[in-house]
Amino acid sequence: MTLAELNTALKTITGFSKKVVYRAWPVGQAPPLPFITYMVDDSDNFGADDIVYKAINRVNIELYSKNKDTVSEGLIEALLESLSIYWEKDETYIDDEQCYEIIYTIEV
């Protein structure tokens, strides 16, 4: 899967067609919560003999919401499972923004 394909897939989630962006919204242009951002965080390439045989990007998909949003979390998880993408999940509360951040880490 490419990043463009991931972007398209995330926009198919009910309620998020215009609430998905790579990395961050321009200052002052973020839509109301909830919304999704995604970005390449790292790589975990497969290689040998000083050659990369398979480039693998580690991508964070971040769901931001005012309250704990198990419905949106379930929709993201169902999408990833339908695409046969293994994911790990982490959660934090951002005091300055007064919102929850759910981070899904995947590899593409």
What spans do the regions from the language model cover?
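Short, charged interaction patches at domain edges and termini
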Residues: 1-9, 41-48, 52-56, 90-108
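Active-site-adjacent structural patch at catalytic or cofactor/ligand-binding sites
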Residues: 57-62
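Short, conserved charged micro-motifs
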Residues: 68-75
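Low-complexity, intrinsically disordered Gly/Pro/Thr-rich segments
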Residues: 80-93
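Short beta-strand-to-loop capping motifs
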Residues: 63-67, 106-108
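Small/polar-rich, solvent-exposed N-terminal microdomains that initiate assembly or binding
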Residues: 1-43
